[in-house]
Regions:
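ABC ATPase C-loop
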Residues: 128, 149-150
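Hydrophobic anchor residue at the start of the ABC signature
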Residues: 146
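ABC ATPase NBD coupling module
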Residues: 65-79, 103-105, 109
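Short helical segment in ABC ATPase nucleotide-binding domains corresponding to the A-loop/adjacent helical element
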Residues: 94-102, 112, 116
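Conserved ABC ATPase signature
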Residues: 132-136, 140-142
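A short, proline-enriched helix->beta-strand linker immediately N-terminal to the Walker B motif
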Residues: 151-155
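Helix-to-loop junction immediately C-terminal to a conserved catalytic motif
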Residues: 49
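Conserved ABC ATPase "signature" region
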Residues: 109-127
Length: 273
């Protein structure tokens, strides 16, 4: 679905943001770009929709080099969810969600019908349809953001730290709902985060980037914990030397804890990635 083929990017000031990154994202899966600030996560994501172009290498989406696709057409075929949701404050919730269908030529009635269906899909009460973003909680606004991202029936969803500003309980709920939504709809998700717990919860595969835009390792959560590729990955996942994460089977699934016994995440039974 998405392939980064030996992608590098150097900013005009000479700073290397990405250094020869190759990565493949399978259809209907979630790939998490995990790393510290300045590791190139968002830069890599922005190349999918041609917001940035590689200095060298290629980005392939749905079998085509994005350099050969009209950028407006490409961007309208992809859904986006950002940390601040990016909603129009002067528009109602239903109008926010209906933005893309309206741009694509759908009637107001058709767009509103689609928006209400998407509200159902992401767990938003239809009674909120005529409210404005400022009248919603942070978690509700993010649900609106997800609904709007799906409004154009996009098969690819780009998510840049969408839950980072939310409180832990709301964040955990949205993570579970996103995973369930992906399974129901079959969307391909590229998800940026610096949070290990979130990466383990959501990622079918996790791509760890380190400073300088170097792809340190790609694998499942189990791979990262049990077989880190280098000292950076070992340190990042807390498995350097004797500081190893633990995995314990429970009736609810596999519980991953840090070396001090603090739980990092729970992978439901059969979903150890």
């Amino acid at each position: 679905m998405i392939t980064f083929d030996h992608v590098s990017h150097v900013f005009p000031n000479g700073t290397t943001a990405l250094d020869d990154v190759s990565l493949h994202v399978e259809p209907h899966t979630t790939t998490v770009l995990l790393g510290t600030s300045g590791s190139g996560k968002t830069t890599l994501m922005r190349m999918v929709n041609r917001m940035l172009s590689p200095t060298s290498g290629r980005v392939i989406v749905r079998g085509q080099n994005v350099a050969d696709i009209d950028p407006v057409k490409l961007r309208r075929s992809i859904g986006y969810v950002l940390q601040d949701a990016g909603l129009f404050p002067h528009r109602t919730i239903v109008d926010n969600i209906a933005t893309v269908p309206r741009l694509e030529g759908a009637s107001r009635r058709e767009s509103a019908k689609r928006a209400l269906e998407l509200m159902d899909l992401v767990g938003l009460d239809r009674g909120l349809a005529k409210r404005y973003p400022a009248q919603l909680s942070g978690g509700q606004r993010q649900r609106v953001g997800v609904a709007r991202a799906l409004a154009n029936e996009a098969d690819i969803l780009l998510m840049d730290e969408p839950f980072g500003a939310l409180d832990p309980l709301v964040r955990a709920d949205l993570q579970r709902e996103l995973r369930d939504l992906r399974d129901r709809v079959g969307t391909t998700i590229l998800f940026v985060t610096h949070d290990l717990d979130e990466a383990f919860m959501l990622g079918d595969q996790i791509a760890v980037l380190q400073t300088g835009g170097v792809l340190a390792q790609v694998g499942t959560s189990e791979n990262l914990v049990t077989n880190p590729a280098n000292d950076f990955v070992a340190s990042f996942v807390g498995s350097s030397g004797q500081r190893r994460l633990s995995m314990k089977s429970t009736p609810a699934g596999t519980l991953i804890s840090d070396p001090d016994g603090r739980p990092l995440g729970l992978l439901p039974e059969g979903e150890l990635r």
